[in-house]
Amino acid sequence: MKVHATKGHAAAKARAGKVHAIDRDTLTLLLEMGKSSWPNEYMVLLGAEEGVINMVYPIAGSGGGSDASYIMMDMVPLGMSFVGTAHSHPNGVVRPSDTDYSTFAETGQVHIIVGSPFDEYSWRAFGRDGHPVKLEIVSEE
């Protein structure tokens, strides 16, 4: 699977601060997006508050096909902060591709891959270096 972010303006930036969890509703949304975009990939940016991923940012002009997805970083709103990306692998393989590794290094600290069958067991999180990271699933009130 090929995933890439096109270079954009410097005003859109990855936010610092340790991400340790993902909101259950946000995870459910990412999985549902995978189902609805199947057999194509999708890619979005992720936002967080107090270390919990709880925002999904679809970016205008971004897209995906059966073996690739991309984000148009020059379309990210000025001043918007994000902590990473999420994208789907319709074939169900929730491991980073070679292209994913370069995207991870350029676009934040946490990257989520969801895969078919898009259930609570078919996703993984990775750090900038492509190594798996553990995210707690929490319910925000």
Model-identified regions with their sequence ranges:
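Conserved beta-strand-loop surface patch within small alpha/beta domains used
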Residues: 1-82, 91-141
